[in-house]
Amino acid sequence: MNARNSGAAKKRIGIVGVGNIGASILRGLLAAAEPGAAEEGARIFLSDVDKERLGFFSSSRVVVCESNAEVAEKSEVVILAVKPNDVRKVVEEISPFLSGGQKVLISVAAGVPTSAVENWFAEAGVGVGVEAGVGVGVEAEAGVEAEAGVEAGVEGREGARVKVVRVMPNVGARVREAVSAVCRGKYATEEDEELAKWIFSAVGTVHSVKESELDVVTGLSGSGIAFFAEVLDAVAAGGVHEGLPYELSLAIAAETAVGAARLVLAGEKPSAIKEMTASPGGTTVRGLYALESRAVKAAMMMAVIAATRRAREIAEQKSRQIKNQNSK
């Protein structure tokens, strides 16, 4: 992580929700911290509905907050790692502290488009009076007349400038080997996207995509990690069938998969790897023939296609739910 050049390491980061993904991001950020970072003061702020869970994250760089609003108030970047159905509620809680377009919200909620999050902030009043420098919510508490916010309301609701970045990591984040896809909303800048990429590089690799491509990434990576696990289990079972203990067979299968992946990442094409190992009449070509005769390649393709189509269905369902909520 090139934190020295980006300046991202100096950002105060808030994480709302420390379940599997939120906790993985936190651990990755702490592990990637530069030497001496702890001495500079706490830069990570946490909240979660499960207060007991928060007790597991004690560190000189971490502050456990009493509320989601406190996290948003103290942070420059807020990572929303809550369930999709909870996003709107959290947006309403933190909206007074994201006005003015200075802070960045990063959402990892599956199936919730950036446009929906932006609209929810607009409905909550973020951006109201931005042109006139009035922040409804915070300023109103300080005694600014509510009518001022109402007068600016129409333009403010249309012109809310909350910078939203959407990220979809996979469960590899638990061991800092996630593959994450990043896209930005209407008001987020390229710099905001780079900031999100820096944060998520703490738990693996990151790729920029269009938001319309996220469903495919879900099928390929979000679900795909389970497909590879299925393959590993099957290969290990083959080793067991031929006499190896399962744990040894599984370890060898996983290590072999890592080697194949690293060859590909180093520039080798999958077809070239097969050519390296498949000699005429040998063991590899016999095994490849067995795979081809049972249409394993087609089955793997169909798994990605089926998962992608289901991701699209879920996204469409979520969009309909959002429209129904907005119409009430």
Residue ranges and their predicted role:
Residues 44, 54, 71, 87, ...:
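Small-residue helix-packing motif on alpha-helices
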Residues 1-73, 240-242:
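NAD(P)+-binding Rossmann beta1-loop-alpha1 motif at the extreme N-terminus of oxidoreductases
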Residues 3-9, 31-40, 122-161, 321-327:
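Intrinsically disordered, low-complexity terminal tails and inter-domain linkers enriched
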Residues 116-126, 157-163, 179-216, 229-266, ...:
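Internal alpha-helical scaffold of NAD(P)-dependent oxidoreductase catalytic cores
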Residues 165, 214-219, 270-275:
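Short pre-catalytic strand/loop immediately N-terminal to key active-site residues, enriched for Gly-Thr
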Residues 2-3, 251-328:
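NAD(P)-dependent Rossmann-like dehydrogenase/reductase catalytic/cofactor-binding core
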Residues 26, 68-80, 84-139, 149-182:
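Rossmann-like NAD(P)(H) cofactor-binding subdomain of soluble oxidoreductases
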